[in-house]
Amino acid sequence: MSLIKVKIFILISFFFLNSNALSKKVLPAEILTADESFVVSLLKEKNTLKVSIKINERSYIYSEHLSLTDGKRTIFYDIIGESEVIRDDFYGESLIFKNLVIIVLENIDKFKGKTLLLSYQGCLENLICYPKISREIIVGEENKPNFFLKKL
């Protein structure tokens, strides 16, 4: 075989091997939507509202991008969840929540008839970072003590 044919063979082989390896890196087994990565639910216990965010095992939420407001002011709440400090490609060193985070809002009666705004942002395995996600929590009136979760 001539030297030129060998070089061409090597180049073509390298191209196919490389393209196969790259396709596995770029195309992960499963890209999840934000709704698949983060499932929000509400639970009222007496005068307390618990906002649960179930986080897919491959996803996480940034602590500094998690908030609850009444539209104007930040609402203070307790938080329950597994957190850790990571370094990722999007925000560098950050405190994140994994698996499940629960926002505990005491004295929920003072918010009757109001709409609260839950906002959060997270990523999927350092592959994609979701844009900020916001959900309205509509607190029922005095005679209608229901809670509704609405996507924005």
What residues fall within each predicted segment?
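Extracellular/lumen-exposed scaffold segments
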Residues: 2-3, 7-8, 19-152
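Hydrophobic core
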Residues: 14-17
